[in-house]
């Protein structure tokens, strides 16, 4: 299902829009020009119907496609519905903002980087700073922080309502009992914890994502602590659909975990996030620990800067324990070394 260029809202200014419109709607058909403009505000709460923002339009398009699938019951279908919220900017119809009181939101207790963490490890939240109503440097005010958290909740509730419409259409079209549904996010989000906003880090709040699966024959209402990677979703879908997964797929099916939440698929997972100057942060997460190894690709292992966190004793990641637990570090680095080394997203061009 197309995204309908919903991120173009970032480049419109509120004062340029008629009161019955939204920044997002105003720019759906002007996306080429939108990229030439400075970013607008980080939030918006126009008193408009759901389909005046992108996710409402996406939901309507998904429903049309489900209705078309009903007309061909003998044909299987695959539908990828990519909702944008709660990505920045935090925009949603006013009724979703009205679900919450901004003053009721508590600010994070921990608003500083982990003790002993390298200076470059926390995100500088440049994505948020690009918006005209956000500071170019320094922290946001407590009022701004509450407003952003309010916006995140409103945007999440808005997306949830659109998802509900799609699921209702699946049911009303008689497709629900024979359809596999997977809901997941592509990253987490810092909401002021550790003094950070946005994603772009290797910390738990940014790296951990929700994954929800509903499928025929799978009992609902269960939770699991099993570790998975997003690469595991493809082979899981293939197994649930009784289809062979391509041999070259890196992921592992977790279909058996859906039947038995106490089962496991992986003993650890890997994720990566870079920093300037060519540094790559390769992270390994087990049920108890996360180790982050910061170094340039192909650099000697002894050049690495390390972070280690113990979620059993320190779930909030308040202190880097790498110097205090060398045995754990050595064990996790040995596991990490069994995986291919990550490369920069954009290779440095050789100077001529």
Description of each model-found segment:
Residues 45-53, 141-154, 198, 218-228, ...:
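Active-site rim elements
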Residues 126-147, 155, 159, 277-280, ...:
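Long, internal low-complexity/basic segments
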Residues 1-49, 199, 281:
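Catalytic-site neighborhoods of secreted/periplasmic enzymes
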Residues 4, 8-12, 18-19, 70, ...:
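C-terminal cap/loop subdomain of S1 sulfatases and analogous C-terminal strand-loop tails that border
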Residues 76-83, 152, 156-159, 163, ...:
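Beta-strand elements within well-structured catalytic alpha/beta cores of enzymes
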Residues 2-24, 54-114, 159, 171-180, ...:
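Active-site regions of oxyanion-processing enzymes, predominantly non-cytosolic
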Residues 89-94, 169-222, 229:
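Histidine-centered active-site microenvironments of extracellular/periplasmic hydrolases
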Residues 1-3, 75, 85-92, 99, ...:
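Short catalytic/ligand-binding loop motif for oxyanion handling, primarily in non-cytosolic enzymes
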């Amino acid at each position: 299902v197309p995204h309908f260029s919903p991120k173009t809202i970032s480049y419109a200014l509120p004062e340029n829009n008629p009161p019955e419109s939204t920044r997002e709607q105003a720019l759906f058909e002007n996306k080429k020009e939108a990229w030439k403009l400075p970013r607008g505000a980080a939030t918006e709460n126009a008193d408009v119907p759901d389909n005046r923002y992108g996710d409402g339009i996406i939901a309507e398009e998904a429903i049309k496609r489900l209705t078309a699938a009903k007309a061909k019951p003998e044909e299987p279908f695959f539908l990828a519905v990519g909702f944008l919220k709660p990505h920045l900017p935090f925009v949603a119809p006013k009724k979703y903002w009205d679900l919450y009181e901004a003053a009721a939101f508590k600010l994070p207790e921990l608003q500083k980087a982990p003790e002993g963490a390298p200076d470059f490890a926390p995100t500088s939240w440049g994505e948020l700073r690009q918006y005209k109503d956000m500071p170019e440097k320094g922290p946001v005010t407590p009022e701004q922080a509450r407003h952003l958290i309010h916006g995140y909740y409103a945007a999440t509730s808005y997306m949830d309502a659109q998802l509900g419409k799609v699921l209702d259409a699946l049911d009303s079209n008689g497709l629900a009992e024979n359809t596999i549904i997977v809901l997941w996010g592509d990253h987490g989000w810092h909401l002021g914890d550790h003094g950070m906003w946005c994603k772009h880090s290797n910390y738990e709040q940014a790296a951990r994502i929700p994954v929800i699966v509903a499928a025929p024959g799978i009992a609902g209402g269960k939770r699991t602590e099993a570790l998975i990677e997003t690469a595991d979703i493809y082979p899981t879908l293939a197994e649930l659909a009784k289809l062979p997964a391509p041999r070259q797929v890196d992921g592992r099916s977790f279909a058996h975990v859906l039947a038995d939440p106490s089962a496991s698929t992986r003993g650890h997972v890997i994720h990566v996030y870079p920093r300037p100057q060519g540094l790559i942060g390769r992270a390994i997460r087990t049920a108890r620990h996360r180790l982050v190894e910061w170094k340039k690709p192909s650099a000697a292992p002894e050049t690495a800067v390390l972070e280690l966190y113990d979620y059993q004793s320190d779930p909030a990641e308040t202190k880097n324990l790498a110097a205090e637990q060398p045995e754990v570090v050595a064990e996790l680095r040995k596991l990490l070394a069994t995986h291919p080394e990550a490369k920069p997203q954009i290779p440095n061009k050789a100077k001529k």
